[in-house]
C-alpha cells in the first residue's frame, strides 16, 4: 500500500524533486530540477532508522569482487551539470570513476536499481539530499607562482589547474609558461603533493620548431604564447605547426602594443587553426583596443580571466595597479603608463559581461596572482550570471534560470576540458569520468563547498575543531582530508600531459607517482563544440570610443555597485 506524504515532508527528508526550485547562494538564480532518477519509496538514506542497512538498501551478499558493487554512493543529490542538466539522482563511484547516475541500492529488495550501482558492505555512503553536486572546476590560466595556490583553488571547487611557471620569477609573474625540460621536470616533481590535477604549458614563443617540440615531449600538455616573450606571426605559426603535429593546444596572450601587427595580422598567422585566446576582452592583455573581436571566429576558443568578472565600480581602478606590478612596468616611465592605460577600457569590459551572457565568450579562468584570483573563479562566474539576469532579464521563458545556469557552469567545467583535450576525463559528471565532485549546500553555492572529492575520495572539506566531540564546533575552516595526504594524494590526482611524453615514459624518467593521462583531440575542436557557449556573431569595435557592436547593435551595461556571494560570506 502506497503512502502519500506532503511535498514539503518529502523535500525535508529526501531533498527537492522534479519541479522544485532551488536558489543558488544569495543570487537571484533559481534552478529547477528537470528529471528525477529515483524510485519513490526506494530512496537510499543512511542513518539511524534509515534504509541503508543490511538486507534493506544494502545487499547482504554482494562482495567487491562483483564489478557492480560501488565504493562510494552519493545519494539523493541534486546535480547541476552542463552535459547532464539539472537533475536528481544517486551518483555511483568505483575505482575513482563515476560508474552510474541513477538509483543505487540493493536489487534483491528494491525496484529499478541501476545494474552497476549496488550498495554492499564495501560501499561508503553520503546523504546528498540537501546538497548540490557539480563537476570539479577547471582553471586554464594558472601562473605557478607559488604552490599554495592549489589549496585556495580547491577550496572554491577547482580540481584541475592548467598553466605554467616555475615559482616567483619575473617570467612566471607575467607569463604562464614552464620553459624547457629542466623546469618542466622539476615542476612535475614539485607538484606531487598538490591535491589537484595539473597540466603545464611549455613556452610557445619560438619561431623554430625543435625547441617547441622538445617541451611537448618533456610533458607539456600545450604551448603558451605570450606578448612579453614576443607574440609575432612567426612565433604563432611555429607553435601551431607543432600543436597540429603533436595534438596539443596553443594558448595565446596577443600583442597589446601591436608591435608586430594588428589583430588582423594575428588572425592571418593563425590561419583558421584552433587556438585558445586568454582574457579575450583585453584588460589582461591583447591587441588594443579590439582583441575582443577574436571571439567571433569559429576557430577561436575565447576565455576571460576573473578580475574583470563582473564589471563593477571598482574594476578600472584596481586593474591599473595590478598591471604595473604583473608586467614589470614603471609609473615613472610615460610609455609604461600609456601601455597600461591602453589595456584598461570600461567599454570593452562592459561588453564582456554581455558577450558571456550571449554565449560568445566560452571559458572562465583566474590568471592566478598575475591580475587574477585563483580562489574566485567559481564565485566570479556566478556573480556575472546574477548581474546579467538583473540587467538583461531571463534567458528564455521557462520560469526558471536553468539555461543560464547551464551556460555559466559550462564555462569553468566542460568547455575548458574540451579546449585542452581532457573532456574524456573531467569537466562533467558523466559516467566514465574521474569522480572529481564538489558538494555544496545551496545557500553556499559558488562560494564555499561542503567538501571536494578527488577520484572518489574526499580531499578537502569544511571541518570543525578536531578535538571536539562532534565534527561541527568552531572554528570551522577548510582542512586537507585523507585524500590529500601521503600516497592517497598521488592516487587521487593526475597529470595531464602530451601523448608524446607518455610514449617517452616521463613518469619513470622523472620518478613521479601520479598517473599521467594524455590529452587528445586538441586540434579537432572548434567554437561549435563548446557547450552552451558557441555563438559566433560579427563583433566590431570603434577604434576611438571603444564601443563594441554585435551584429551592428551596440552592447554595454552599467557597472555593478553590489554583487552577491560577497561580504555576506566573508569576514575580510
From Swiss-Prot:
<dbReference type="InterPro" id="IPR011059">
    <property type="entry name" value="Metal-dep_hydrolase_composite"/>
</dbReference>
<feature type="binding site" description="via carbamate group">
    <location>
        <position position="224"/>
    </location>
    <ligand>
        <name>Ni(2+) 1</name>
    </ligand>
</feature>
<feature type="binding site">
    <location>
        <position position="367"/>
    </location>
    <ligand>
        <name>Ni(2+) 1</name>
    </ligand>
</feature>
<feature type="binding site">
    <location>
        <position position="141"/>
    </location>
    <ligand>
        <name>Ni(2+) 1</name>
    </ligand>
</feature>
<keyword id="KW-0479">Metal-binding</keyword>
<comment type="pathway">
    <text>Nitrogen metabolism; urea degradation; CO(2) and NH(3) from urea (urease route): step 1/1.</text>
</comment>
<dbReference type="GO" id="GO:0005737">
    <property type="term" value="C:cytoplasm"/>
</dbReference>
<dbReference type="InterPro" id="IPR011612">
    <property type="entry name" value="Urease_alpha_N_dom"/>
</dbReference>
<dbReference type="InterPro" id="IPR050112">
    <property type="entry name" value="Urease_alpha_subunit"/>
</dbReference>
<feature type="binding site">
    <location>
        <position position="226"/>
    </location>
    <ligand>
        <name>substrate</name>
    </ligand>
</feature>
<feature type="binding site">
    <location>
        <position position="253"/>
    </location>
    <ligand>
        <name>Ni(2+) 2</name>
    </ligand>
</feature>
<feature type="binding site" description="via carbamate group">
    <location>
        <position position="224"/>
    </location>
    <ligand>
        <name>Ni(2+) 2</name>
    </ligand>
</feature>
<feature type="modified residue" description="N6-carboxylysine">
    <location>
        <position position="224"/>
    </location>
</feature>
<dbReference type="Pfam" id="PF00449">
    <property type="entry name" value="Urease_alpha"/>
</dbReference>
<comment type="similarity">
    <text>Belongs to the metallo-dependent hydrolases superfamily. Urease alpha subunit family.</text>
</comment>
<feature type="binding site">
    <location>
        <position position="143"/>
    </location>
    <ligand>
        <name>Ni(2+) 1</name>
    </ligand>
</feature>
<dbReference type="InterPro" id="IPR006680">
    <property type="entry name" value="Amidohydro-rel"/>
</dbReference>
<dbReference type="InterPro" id="IPR017951">
    <property type="entry name" value="Urease_asu_c"/>
</dbReference>
<feature type="active site" description="Proton donor">
    <location>
        <position position="327"/>
    </location>
</feature>
<comment type="subunit">
    <text>Heterotrimer of UreA (gamma), UreB (beta) and UreC (alpha) subunits. Three heterotrimers associate to form the active enzyme.</text>
</comment>
<keyword id="KW-0378">Hydrolase</keyword>
<dbReference type="GO" id="GO:0016151">
    <property type="term" value="F:nickel cation binding"/>
</dbReference>
<protein>
    <recommendedName>
        <fullName>Urease subunit alpha</fullName>
        <ecNumber>3.5.1.5</ecNumber>
    </recommendedName>
</protein>
<keyword id="KW-0963">Cytoplasm</keyword>
<dbReference type="InterPro" id="IPR005848">
    <property type="entry name" value="Urease_asu"/>
</dbReference>
<dbReference type="Pfam" id="PF01979">
    <property type="entry name" value="Amidohydro_1"/>
</dbReference>
<dbReference type="InterPro" id="IPR029754">
    <property type="entry name" value="Urease_Ni-bd"/>
</dbReference>
<dbReference type="GO" id="GO:0009039">
    <property type="term" value="F:urease activity"/>
</dbReference>
<dbReference type="InterPro" id="IPR017950">
    <property type="entry name" value="Urease_AS"/>
</dbReference>
<feature type="binding site">
    <location>
        <position position="279"/>
    </location>
    <ligand>
        <name>Ni(2+) 2</name>
    </ligand>
</feature>
<dbReference type="GO" id="GO:0043419">
    <property type="term" value="P:urea catabolic process"/>
</dbReference>
<feature type="domain" description="Urease">
    <location>
        <begin position="136"/>
        <end position="572"/>
    </location>
</feature>
<dbReference type="InterPro" id="IPR032466">
    <property type="entry name" value="Metal_Hydrolase"/>
</dbReference>
<keyword id="KW-0533">Nickel</keyword>
Amino acid at each position: 500500500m502506497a503512502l502519500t506524504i506532503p511535498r514539503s515532508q518529502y523535500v525535508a527528508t529526501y531533498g527537492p524533486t522534479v519541479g522544485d526550485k532551488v536558489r543558488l547562494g544569495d543570487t537571484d538564480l533559481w534552478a529547477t530540477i528537470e528529471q528525477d532518477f529515483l524510485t519513490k519509496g526506494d530512496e537510499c538514506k543512511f542513518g539511524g532508522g534509515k534504509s541503508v542497512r543490511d538486507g534493506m538498501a544494502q545487499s547482504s551478499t554482494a562482495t567487491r569482487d562483483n564489478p557492480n558493487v560501488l565504493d562510494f554512493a552519493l545519494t539523493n543529490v541534486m546535480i547541476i551539470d552542463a552535459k547532464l542538466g539539472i537533475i536528481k539522482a544517486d551518483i555511483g563511484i568505483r575505482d575513482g570513476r563515476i560508474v552510474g547516475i541513477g538509483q543505487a541500492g540493493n536489487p534483491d529488495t528494491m525496484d529499478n536499481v541501476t545494474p552497476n550501482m549496488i550498495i554492499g558492505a564495501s560501499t561508503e555512503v553520503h546523504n546528498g539530499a540537501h546538497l548540490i553536486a557539480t563537476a570539479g572546476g577547471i582553471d586554464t590560466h594558472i601562473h605557478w607562482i607559488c604552490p599554495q595556490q592549489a589549496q585556495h583553488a580547491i577550496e572554491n571547487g577547482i580540481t584541475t589547474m592548467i598553466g605554467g611557471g616555475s615559482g616567483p620569477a619575473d617570467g612566471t609573474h607575467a607569463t604562464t609558461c614552464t620553459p624547457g625540460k629542466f623546469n618542466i621536470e622539476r615542476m612535475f616533481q614539485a607538484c606531487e603533493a598538490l591535491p589537484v590535477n595539473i597540466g603545464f604549458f611549455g613556452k610557445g614563443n619560438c619561431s623554430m620548431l625543435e625547441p617547441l617540440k622538445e617541451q611537448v615531449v618533456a610533458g607539456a600538455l600545450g604551448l603558451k604564447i605570450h606578448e612579453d616573450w614576443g607574440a609575432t606571426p612567426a612565433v604563432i605559426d611555429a607553435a601551431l605547426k607543432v600543436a597540429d603535429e603533436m595534438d596539443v593546444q596553443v594558448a595565446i596572450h596577443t600583442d597589446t602594443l601591436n608591435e608586430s601587427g594588428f589583430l588582423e595580422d594575428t588572425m592571418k598567422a593563425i590561419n583558421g587553426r584552433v587556438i585558445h585566446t586568454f582574457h579575450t576582452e583585453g584588460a589582461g592583455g591583447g591587441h588594443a583596443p579590439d582583441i575582443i573581436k577574436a571571439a567571433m571566429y569559429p576557430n577561436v576558443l575565447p576565455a576571460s580571466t576573473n578580475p574583470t568578472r563582473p564589471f563593477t565600480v571598482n574594476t578600472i581602478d584596481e586593474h591599473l595597479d595590478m598591471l604595473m606590478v604583473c608586467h614589470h612596468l614603471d609609473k615613472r616611465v610615460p610609455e609604461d603608463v600609456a601601455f597600461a592605460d591602453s589595456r584598461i577600457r570600461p567599454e570593452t569590459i562592459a561588453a564582456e559581461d554581455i558577450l558571456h551572457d550571449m554565449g560568445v565568450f566560452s571559458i572562465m579562468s583566474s590568471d592566478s596572482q598575475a591580475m587574477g584570483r585563483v580562489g574566485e573563479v567559481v564565485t566570479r562566474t556566478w556573480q556575472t550570471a546574477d548581474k546579467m539576469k538583473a540587467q538583461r532579464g531571463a534567458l528564455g521563458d521557462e520560469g526558471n534560470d536553468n539555461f543560464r545556469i547551464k551556460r555559466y557552469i559550462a564555462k569553468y567545467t566542460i568547455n575548458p576540458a574540451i579546449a585542452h583535450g581532457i573532456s574524456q576525463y573531467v569537466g562533467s559528471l558523466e559516467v566514465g569520468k574521474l569522480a572529481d565532485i564538489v558538494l555544496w549546500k545551496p545557500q553556499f553555492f559558488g562560494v564555499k563547498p561542503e567538501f571536494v572529492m578527488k577520484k572518489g575520495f574526499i580531499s578537502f572539506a569544511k571541518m570543525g575543531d578536531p578535538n571536539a566531540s562532534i565534527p561541527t564546533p568552531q572554528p570551522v575552516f577548510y582542512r586537507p582530508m585523507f585524500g590529500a595526504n601521503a600516497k592517497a594524494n598521488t592516487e587521487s590526482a593526475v597529470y595531464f600531459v602530451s601523448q608524446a611524453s607518455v610514449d617517452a615514459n616521463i613518469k619513470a624518467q622523472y620518478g613521479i607517482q601520479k598517473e599521467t593521462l594524455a590529452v587528445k583531440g586538441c586540434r579537432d575542436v572548434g567554437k561549435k563544440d563548446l557547450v552552451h557557449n558557441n555563438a559566433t556573431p560579427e563583433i566590431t569595435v570603434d577604434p576611438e570610443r571603444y564601443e563594441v557592436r554585435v551584429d551592428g547593435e551596440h552592447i554595454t551595461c552599467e557597472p555593478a555597485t553590489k554583487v552577491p556571494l560577497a561580504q555576506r560570506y566573508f569576514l575580510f
